[in-house]
Amino acid sequence: MPPVEEARQSTSAVSTGSDIPALPSKTMNGKPSNGHPPKGTNGATNTNWRRRSKYRHVEAYHSRVRHSSLSREPNVTASFLGFRNLMVIVLVAMNLRLIIENFMKYGVLICIRCHDYRKQDVVLGSALFALVPFHLYVSYLIELAAATQAKRIVGRKKKDISTEVNEREQRIFKNTWWISAFFHCLNTLLSLGITSFVVYFYVHHPGIGTLCELQALIVSFKICSYAFTNRDLREAMLNPSVESALPEIYASCPYPNNITLGNLGYFWLAPTLVYQPVYPRSSHIRWSFVAKRLFEFFCLAVFIWLLSAQYAAPVLRNSIDKIAVMDIASILERVMKLSTISLIIWLAGFFALFQALLNALAEVMRFGDREFYTDWWNSSSLGMYWRSWNRPVYLFMKRHVYSPLVGRGWSPLAASTAVFTLSAVLHEVLVGIPTHNLIGM
């Protein structure tokens, strides 16, 4: 048989039963080894080849061992980003439904003129807001007297370094500390006590009362930190040792050079509750940054007010009769309905205070350390959350309450319990006094 006839017969022997001619090329599993049509073929032949390879019913789709995406297998790493996006969409849709339902049921409840801003509240609130910082000046006078006494002790020790003189100076130092500590405590109690008394009995608007009480608490924290820190600075100056070594950052302003009104004034306005003679500073003020943060704060403050007036207030009013008759099912429904609104208000308030306002203040004061919070949203425990969401208060409690208690022999659990109790009392003061609703009273 001639070679041409033999080739034709072999070609027809592998026919697929269609009119598409077989392509004379090297194949692997019925396909060209390179996955493309053979070279040297025309356009019609290429189209026929692609059509035949596309509709092959013998393709091996199950060619390796695989697991389901949600299986708990060691080599399976599934991404749940789509579920997160779905939850965001559902959350937005549910809140839009609540907004529509609220407007259909109540209409527009926002009323600027309906707020009861009494003249007495405005006058007393303004007076308290202006006079409370005066207690910082009193603490400055106390520390100035203690610093003067410390300089005298250092001068006498340089003249006479005998043991008897050292013991006498140590007694003087301890007496000075106890006297200054007494006046600092009295000053702090007056700052917080007078403000709390006036707000509880004479200021009826909770917003004005909260601002006054918050400033009194901040000033009280700053007075305590100012007193404790300068006490240790005096100790380090009078008794220099390895144990009393100071941080290197303090070298540019040694004690008692830090006892000035300018130094205390900076601490008063700085966004921190922990006193240091020196803070890390930024090189310049970015006024555009300040404007953006203040704009964010203003917008979020208005947003919180709108949510409170339009959504939170009606739910609370409608809950009074349910609580009176102890309708448990209705109470639970109101609590869950209010929880969404409360969460949004809390998140907006957190961003407005810790991100917008404190960053704007830090920029104006050129305050460098702006870690006012960390990623509390990733907290795996309640303790981690407390340490993350409000860093200024956490650092104050750790430096002036927790660490001294542990240093005096308290167990970490007992010290943490003391910090928790003190924090709970102060939160009750901040919330209960302006709203005239102290627990147990």
Model-found features: residue ranges?
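Membrane-interfacial catalytic/cofactor-binding modules of polytopic membrane enzymes
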Residues: 249-296, 318-435
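Membrane-lumen (extracellular) interface motif
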Residues: 96-125, 144-151, 173-179, 195-211, ...
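Membrane-proximal N-terminal segments immediately preceding the first transmembrane helix
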Residues: 34, 42, 51-75, 98-114, ...
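Intramembrane catalytic core of multi-pass membrane enzymes that act on lipidic substrates
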Residues: 5, 12, 29, 34, ...
